Structure formats: structure tokens, C-alpha cells
Amino acid sequence: MRNFILRRLLQTLPMLLLASFIIFLLFAKTPGDFIDGNITLTAARAAELKAIYGLDQPLLTRYLNWLGQLLRGDLGFSLQYQIPVSQLLNQYIWNSFLLASVALVFYWGIGLAVGVVSALRPGSWFDHLVSVAVFAAMSFPTFFLCLLLIKWFAVDLHWLPVGGMTNTGSDESGWQYVLQVAAHLALPVLALVMLQAGSLTRYVRASMLDVVKMDFIRTARAKGLQERTVILKHALRNALLPIITLLGFELPGLFSGAIITEKVFNWPGAGHIHIDSLAARDYPVLMGFTLFLAVLTIVGNLLADVLYAWADPRIRVRS
């Protein structure tokens, strides 16, 4: 397993290099930037600022300079916020991690449990109810679902706060602060779970339906094993093999998918500043966040490969 992980780590290096070049090239060739979009600047001042930030240099030189900065942990300087991009992301990225990780735990738990039960009772009222609920939740646009949840739980019922991370002017600490953040976290997490759990439930259901019809499941039952052991130890582990592949897309998908959710609920995360930077054409911030998503994609696929090799030792042998 150690050699398998080491080989996978070495394979990620050229992918990271290629991803950094593509990201830089896309933003470098995008028309306009923060300086060009500022109509208050004179042509001379705009040229001076481009020289200061190195935007007047050849494309390859700019990429090599940016790559050198990346290797030193420097993502550049935000033109809009006037602070280093790494410092800016560090202020907001952990709030996004909190939102994404809580949503991930909930919708994987719900998706696995509901998908397994639905597969064990195909054609039942529960299976039909799950199918209707899944397709209904997946059919809602993200912004509309978020606004609907705000209308129901915040405006009409007054159960949960509308948005933000804490109450305005709050100076709570300790458990009071934790409970306050949890209350503000509930609605965005609920929105992400409703949007993401449906597809996972369908994948788990389809995979479990295929596995429970296989010969080794009938053999396990014929040996007199308890149904719980057959399902959890034999069927579920094999059904999870194709689902593990989804994990590689879940990490970046949660952050990119939460951009609209963070904006609607005014959650102070990286997705929130990403939209603001997009409107201001603050390319250093956009490049840093996009590179972060690329790294998450590669790390997610690496994690999926490791989990796949752990679940199916034949993968390690073939590799």
C-alpha cells in the first residue's frame, strides 16, 4: 500500500503543473482586468500599475514568476482587497471547510442509509417516496431552494436566522458561540444536503440492486448468515466500490457548488469572495481559488484511489 500511495503522489506532480499552466493561461487571455475596468484611472496611471504588478511582461515570463511565487506559498496580491491572496483565502477558506465538511457528513450518511433501504425494498411505498423526493429536490435551482428555505424557516417560522455566521454585533464565546454558529449553519447545510444527497442516493440504490442479485450474496444467505451481516459486511462493501469514485468529485464539487449557497446566505466563505472578485475582475484571487479547486480535485482522486485499493486489494496488485 505504501508503494501504491507513493506512485500516486508522484503522478500528481505533473498534473498540478499542467493545471497551474492552464489556469494561468485562461485568466491571462481573458479580456480586461481590474486595472482596465477602473474608469477613474488615466492611461498613464493604468500603464504604471501594470508595470508595478508585472502585467506588461511576456506571457511565459509572467507564468514562470507566478509559478515561482506558488512554490514559495505566495498566491499573489489581491487588487480589490489590497492584501495577499493567501492571507485573504486563509480568512475565509476555513468557513467554507466548515460548511462543506458538515454537509458532506450529513448527505453521505443520509445518501448511504436511504439508498440501501430503498434498494432492499424496491417497488415499495418507501422506494417510490424516495424517488419522488430525490427528483423534486434535484430539480430546484440552487438559488431558488435557498430562498425557499429562508422563506419557510427564517421568515415564516422564525426558527433559524436568515444568514451570516453570527448575530450582528454578537460577542459570544465558548458554547454560546458554537450554538450561534450552528444555528446560522443549519440552513446552508440543509440546502447543500438537499441538492447533493439525491444523486448519491440513486447511485447507492442502483449499486446495491446489482450486488444483492449476485451469486455470492445468495451463497452467504444459504450458509445461514444473518441478514444484517450479509447486507453490511458483504453487499454494502462491494456496492461501495463504484461509489468511491464519486469521492474524487465531491471535494471540489462541494466548494464550487456552495458558491451560490454562500452568497445567498451571506456565509463568509471563499465562494462568497469568489463572486465578489469575479465582478471586480480581481484575477489573482480568482486564480488562487481556481487553483485551490484543482488541488482539491487531484487530492480527491488520490483519496478515491487509496480507498479503492483498500476496498479491493486487486487494484494494488494490478498497479
Spell out what each predicted region is.
Residues 30, 137-140, 255:
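Transmembrane helix irregularities
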Residues 56-112:
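An internal, D/E-rich "acidic patch" concept
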Residues 2-4, 13, 90-126, 142, ...:
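Alpha-helical transmembrane segments of integral membrane proteins
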Residues 43-74, 177, 217, 265-277:
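Short hydrophobic, aromatic-rich alpha-helical segments embedded in or entering the lipid bilayer
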Residues 16-25, 135-152, 247-250:
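Hydrophobic alpha-helical membrane-insertion segments
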